[in-house]
């Protein structure tokens, strides 16, 4: 399916690895010009940058000044904004172990980074009378988990923000949607210091056992791949989804078992 994204100008946050990198790779392959915001780059992202279609802007998007700095270097035209930056620290010590500093850091990264990046990018979209905003949310927005309590709260806030914004800017040609993955085969879950390893350290179970147990809760029996999330994001960014706004798309292998 040709998504007709060639020549579009896109901004992706958190694009150095995992889901974000897959989105950047997909947009570039479709012919879009992509500005990527990340705190640090990666070998894979640097390789994409050498193609000339991808520009990397190093910015701490959890810092209040980071999003405006990124958008300020993205050019005058922004057709697509993908708010992807985020993190889900596992809180194996329970609610009482989560400090004010933990809450603040999680909300800054998982909610306010998207709010601020959207605030910075939206004027250009409104001036053009067109634009697409897709934010990476999470199944934890509707399945709050005590092991990622602060993350669940932040993602619920992100879902509410995007739904409310879609009602405000939809009449002005801007579409706003969210994508909510379940466990994805990325470093956030499976890498050094990821969820599986953190839970392993707290419980004594091997990291692979933790990951296998999580996968068994999904109807498909496996984690979602980053490229599968990216494919969904690219579809929503395209004109094929021109009458879709204010919607949340779950991609979780059947983890959520309710309607």
Question: Could you describe each region identified by the protein language model?
Answer:
Residues 9, 16-17:
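Conserved glycine-rich cofactor-binding loop
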Residues 138:
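Residue(s) in the substrate-gating loop at a strand-loop-helix junction
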Residues 92, 143, 222, 233-234, ...:
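Short C-terminal tail/terminal secondary-structure segment
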Residues 91-95, 99-107, 199, 214:
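Substrate-binding pocket helix/loop in short-chain dehydrogenase/reductase
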Residues 118, 154, 162:
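Active-site helix of classical SDR
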Residues 170, 175, 244-246:
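Short, small/polar-rich loop/turn modules that mediate ligand/substrate recognition or access, typified
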Residues 123, 167-168, 242:
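Alpha-helical segment proximal to the catalytic Tyr-Lys
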């Amino acid at each position: 399916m040709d998504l007709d994204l060639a020549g579009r100008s896109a901004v992706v946050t958190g694009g150095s690895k995992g889901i974000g990198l897959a989105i950047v790779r997909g947009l570039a392959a479709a012919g879009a010009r992509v500005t990527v915001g990340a705190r640090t780059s990666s070998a894979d992202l640097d390789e994409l940058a050498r193609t000339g279609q991808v520009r990397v802007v190093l910015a701490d998007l959890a810092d209040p000044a980071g999003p405006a700095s990124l958008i300020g270097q993205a050019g005058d035209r922004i057709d697509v904004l993908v708010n992807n930056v985020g993190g889900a620290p596992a809180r194996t010590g329970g609610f009482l172990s989560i400090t004010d500093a933990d809450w603040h850091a999680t909300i800054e990264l998982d909610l306010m980074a998207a709010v601020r990046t959207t605030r910075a990018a939206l004027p250009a979209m409104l001036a053009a009378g067109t634009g697409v905003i897709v934010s990476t949310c999470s199944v934890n927005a509707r399945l709050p988990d005590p092991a990622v309590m602060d993350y669940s709260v932040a993602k619920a806030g992100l879902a509410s923000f995007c739904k409310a914004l879609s009602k405000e800017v939809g009449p002005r040609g801007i579409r706003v949607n969210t994508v909510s993955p379940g466990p994805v085969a990325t470093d956030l879950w499976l890498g050094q210091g990821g969820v599986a390893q953190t839970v392993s350290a707290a419980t004594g179970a091997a990291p692979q056992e933790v990951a296998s147990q999580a996968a068994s809760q999904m109807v498909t029996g496996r984690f979602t791949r980053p490229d599968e999330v990216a494919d969904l994001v690219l579809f929503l960014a395209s004109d094929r989804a021109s009458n879709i706004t204010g919607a949340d798309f779950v991609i979780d292998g059947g983890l959520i078992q309710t309607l």
